[in-house]
A protein has these predicted regions:
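A short, flexible beta-alpha/helix-coil linker loop
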Residues: 126-128
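Flexible, gly/ser-rich surface segments that form the specificity/activation loops bordering the active-site cleft
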Residues: 123
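Glycine/threonine-rich flexible loop motifs
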Residues: 130-132
Length: 211
């Protein structure tokens, strides 16, 4: 897990607003340990640099709450979003705990908003090997349509890189998410350049939290 933590440190030091731990093959104990280490790491970066990167856990509500993570992200294979959100809001998680939901259509996004999600991921916007199971790329025009239809923040995902991040942000998306820009084969400079490109292009005012 040292490589994963190294990527998290790179993202945090570059000023990423958050990192999402998406390790679907890890058992509960190993995932718990990784998340705790990630939380300690970003706390160190916060003390060193003042950057406040949040840690979100993909799919595992139980691990996210037990570790004290900042939130959970729910996908199509997770517990139903409506049930998870209700449980969190009824005292199962701290008040500031964030719940996000992956969506692949306007209908999905509206359902997530109605259920009480704090934000949604929408995509794939562009072609991405990790997102092909969810259909063809939807493009910037569809991203704009969905972003304008929602009252909660929308994060664009799927094939996002430093060259097209600004295009996504210009549609009204609150932010972008990327996997390939932080994989092991990517240099630290490339990861930093990606975060800088996102921050320089983002003029949208959103608060994805209750802090």
């Amino acid at each position: 897990m040292r490589d994963v933590l190294a990527r998290i440190r790179t993202a945090a030091e570059a000023g990423a607003d958050w990192v999402q731990i998406r390790e679907k093959d890890l058992g509960s104990g190993a995932l718990y340990a990784l998340v705790r280490d990630a939380l300690a790491l970003v706390a160190d970066v916060r003390r060193e640099r003042g950057a406040a990167t949040r840690v979100i856990v993909n799919g595992r509500l139980d691990v996210a709450v037990a570790c004290g993570a900042d939130g959970v992200h729910l996908g199509h294979a997770s517990v139903p979003a409506q049930d998870a959100i209700r449980w969190c809001r009824n005292g199962g998680a701290p008040r500031e705990f964030i719940v996000g939901v992956s969506c692949h259509s306007l209908e999905d996004a509206r359902s997530a908003e109605a259920a009480g999600a704090d934000y949604v991921f929408f995509g794939p916007v562009f072609d991405s090997p990790s997102k092909r199971e969810f259909g063809a790329p939807q493009g910037a025009a569809k991203l704009r349509e969905v972003a304008r239809a929602l009252r909660i923040p929308l994060i664009a995902i799927g094939g996002i890189n430093a060259s097209n991040a600004r295009e996504c942000l210009q549609t009204g998306a609150a932010g972008v998410a990327a996997i390939r820009e932080f994989q092991d084969s990517v240099t630290d400079d490339r990861a930093r350049n990606f975060v800088e490109a996102v921050h320089s292009g983002n003029r949208n005012e959103y608060q994805i939290a209750k802090r």
